[in-house]
Amino acid sequence: MDSGSKKKVLVAGATGYIGKAVVAELLDRDYIVFAIVRKENQLEYSDQSNLNVISLEIGKNSDWTKQLPKIDIIISCLASRSGCEHDANFVDYSLNSDLLYFALKIELQHFILLSAICIQKPKLAFQRAKLRFNNTLMSSGLRYSIVLPTAFFKSLSGQVNRIKNGKSFLVFGTGKRTSSLPISEIDLAKYIVNCIGSEESWNKSLPVGGPGPAVTPIDQAEMLFKIFDKPKKIKHISPRFFDFVLILLFPVSFFSQKIKDKLELIKIGKYYAEESMLFYDADADAYDASKTPQFGENLLYDYYCSLRDDPDKIPDMGSQKLFS
């Protein structure tokens, strides 16, 4: 484990699922951390001398150089909550661009970006926004590391309450078309912080998943039925469900921003029902678990067990929830 050597690290998105874990990992390694929070948010950590929780408005009109000491490293864990076009353009592109503007102004040492492996096949608004900023960062002249994780444990927890309550597990098609190498927030945070001192991670895009084997939706169902000791009930839904809803809503979307946003959420659901969260081999036109770099030691099965043992830890999926 590398030591922070009193380097100053600014974490944007410090209140998020991965951002909180990154802050904790940095503190464990003795970095001096500046965690950005919005004025309306609260970030609660145990009292640590190396932690500075600051309220800043992200934007080019805000002169951060007057509010912050010289920062050595920026880690951006910013991500839009909904994935809708206006939200994605603002958070995934514009706010990150403002961070980059600040980084160039202070001659930053290293910019580490948490992105997503799904940008390999961009079909959605948030993927295009992420990819647009990734390209901007790569051409900026700054040292960068762009981390492309697979699925988070939290992302594969949307049906835990269904199984806990004796309901069926819902899959699209056979439930075996897609797979992922899910990674825990703790392991991903370690990987992100490792990028600071690992020259092999500099100026690269870095796909990363958790320890294998790859997991399909059917595999998730089998785990949950076993862990919660519930009878196996799997309901198969035709992937055409998404196409039907898209056709139904498309004409109305021209007249309603709310419907347009709903349309984008349906597209997101369709994407994840059809695409694996693994390294995409463009030459073979196929996802490949064997070519997806693996990191960490935490397993999805053990995570599900922890949710059984402490139901209060079952995450609230919010706007990301597809199944109720």
Language-model segment annotations:
Residues 80-166:
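Glycine-/Pro-rich loop/turn segments that contact NAD(P) or position catalytic residues
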